[in-house]
Amino acid sequence: GVTILTSLNSYQTKKYYNNQNVNQLVKKFAINAKKNNLDGIVCSPLEISTVRKEVGNKMLIVVPGIRLEKKQINKKDDQKRILTPKQAINLGADYLVIGRPIVESNNPLKTIKEINKSIIEK
């Protein structure tokens, strides 16, 4: 199941979803996903805790909106609700979707190695 697109900010979410805030909607979608026995759910890194609280460890959490550091974010980047790989994993993400930071990198292999290193570091 999918919750709210990571490209939507709180204003847009309220506009499109009848004045409900992101966490209310994500909670509702997580409960619905659990009730329907889905294997996993896609959510922004900022909602991992909300989803995990509702679904426990019985569902996988897949997380897009992963960025390396705020200073590296392109101004044209449409992702609004983001965290680093390490932050998302620490919150309970099972899988990370890391596209643009790698694809748009001048050296994708180096970027992947940096991501791995950042996850392992304490």
Write out the residue ranges for each language-model feature.
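Catalytic cores of alpha/beta
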Residues: 70-94, 110-111
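N-terminal amphipathic alpha-helix/helix-capping segment at the start of soluble metabolic enzymes
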Residues: 48-49, 53-56, 83, 117-120
